[in-house]
């Protein structure tokens, strides 16, 4: 149904612009005049936000919708509606933009709250080997691998310092744990020296009780071939003593003095002979124990060498794949 001529809004009022303006800018000037005429006094606190929303709504208002068409000042019909006015030409309420929340790029992100994580400690917690140093160079001191904090955007204001961030204290604890791990690894790499006399080889050695009786001094502790140690003087070769030439003494000269001296010499020779035989028995029993222990240790050395060659092959493959340690 056609409207009366008096109810129609003249096109030059909305679409027409002042003299000298381009024909495409009439709709923009008419919409701006309508917005400025219907705007209410704004509060100072929300002035900046409303100004941004109005600037964002201007390009959307000039774009034709799916059911509207914009026409120039020459061919605009009498009942055309431009911008946000009423069909009769009266200024209506301006449609608010669809998104009232602040824009994503205008938000202030907490870039200062960045937690620092030690890379070696993280790998050790998850059962992974630490990162090897670069090959060919000296091993640098372990330094915590910190995540670089991104530079704050132009909209962020007064971001907190990394030192005052709440995640910095757990990071220090993680660094302390990692340093303690490295100290423990270093102490295990260089073990303390071991006294060879305190090492006992697990073996079964049961000497003959008769040999132990011949190797022990009567009235003293039983000889133990496992723990007995001979001195250097005892282990030296003993010289062969030549037997003294026998002197024939006539019967008439064999008095009490002669028999007393001969008795003492026989006792000394017997004591020397018993001591020599005792030492020989001890050395023989000790040598039997050492021979058996030596055979067992040789087998252990062969097993250790095989294990060492296996570990060296594993280490060489690791260095070929990941570089030198």
UniProtKB/Swiss-Prot annotation:
Gene Ontology CC annotation, any one: RNA polymerase II transcription regulator complex
Segments of skewed composition (Pro residues): 129-153
Tissue-specific expression: Ubiquitously expressed. Expressed in the suprachiasmatic nuclei (SCN) and in most peripheral tissues, with a strong circadian rhythmicity.
InterPro entries documented for this protein: bZIP, bZIP_sf, PAR_bZIP
One of the protein's GO biological processes: liver development
Skewed-composition ranges (Gly residues): 17-28
Phosphoserine: residues bearing it: 86
Low complexity composition-biased segments: 29-38, 57-80, 157-167
Keyword Magnesium included in the entry's annotation: no
Chain segments annotated as transmembrane: none
Main location group: nucleus
Keywords assigned: Activator, Biological rhythms, DNA-binding, Nucleus, Phosphoprotein, Transcription, Transcription regulation
Source organism superkingdom: Eukaryota
GO MF annotation terms: DNA-binding transcription activator activity, RNA polymerase II-specific; DNA-binding transcription factor activity, RNA polymerase II-specific; RNA polymerase II cis-regulatory region sequence-specific DNA binding; RNA polymerase II transcription regulatory region sequence-specific DNA binding; sequence-specific double-stranded DNA binding
CDD domains, alphabetized: bZIP_HLF
Domain bZIP: from-to ranges: 255-318
Region (Basic motif): 257-279
Leucine-zipper, as annotated region: 283-297
Role of this protein: This transcriptional activator recognizes and binds to the sequence 5'-RTTAYGTAAY-3' found in the promoter of genes such as albumin, CYP2A4 and CYP2A5. It is not essential for circadian rhythm generation, but modulates important clock output genes. May be a direct target for regulation by the circadian pacemaker component clock. May affect circadian period and sleep regulation.
Subunit structure: Binds DNA as a homodimer or a heterodimer. Can form a heterodimer with TEF.
Name of the protein in question: D site-binding protein
Organism: Homo sapiens
Higher taxonomy: Eukaryota, Metazoa, Chordata, Craniata, Vertebrata
Gene it is expressed from: DBP
């Amino acid at each position: 149904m056609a409207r009366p001529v008096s109810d129609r809004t003249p096109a030059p009022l909305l679409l027409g612009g002042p003299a000298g303006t381009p024909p495409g800018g009439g709709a923009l000037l008419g919409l701006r005049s309508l917005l400025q005429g219907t705007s209410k006094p704004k509060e100072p606190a929300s002035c900046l936000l409303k100004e941004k929303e109005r600037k964002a709504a201007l390009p959307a208002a000039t774009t034709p919708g799916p059911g509207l068409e914009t026409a120039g000042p020459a061919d605009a019909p009498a009942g055309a509606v431009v911008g946000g006015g009423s069909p009769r030409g009266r200024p209506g309420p301006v449609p608010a933009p669809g998104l009232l929340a602040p824009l994503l790029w205008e938000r202030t992100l907490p870039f200062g709250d960045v937690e620092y994580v030690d890379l070696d400690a993280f790998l050790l917690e998850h059962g992974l080997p630490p990162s090897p140093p670069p090959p060919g160079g000296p091993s640098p001191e372990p330094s915590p691998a910190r995540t670089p904090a991104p530079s704050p955007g132009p909209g962020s204001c007064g971001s907190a310092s990394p030192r005052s961030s709440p995640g910095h204290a757990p990071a220090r604890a993680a660094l302390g744990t990692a340093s303690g791990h490295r100290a423990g690894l270093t102490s295990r790499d260089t073990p303390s020296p071991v006294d060879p006399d305190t090492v006992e080889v697990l073996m079964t050695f049961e000497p003959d009780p008769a040999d132990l009786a011949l190797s022990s001094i009567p009235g003293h502790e039983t000889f133990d071939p496992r723990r007995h140690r001979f001195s250097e003087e005892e282990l030296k070769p003993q010289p062969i003593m030549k037997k003294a030439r026998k002197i024939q003494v006539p019967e008439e000269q064999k008095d009490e003095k002669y028999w007393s001296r001969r008795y003492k010499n026989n006792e000394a020779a017997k004591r020397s002979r018993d001591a020599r035989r005792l030492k020989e028995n001890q050395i023989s029993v000790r040598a039997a124990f050492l021979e058996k222990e030596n055979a067992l240790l040789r087998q252990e050395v062969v097993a250790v060498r095989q294990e060492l060659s296996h570990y060296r092959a594993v280490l060489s493959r690791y260095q070929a794949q990941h570089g030198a340690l």
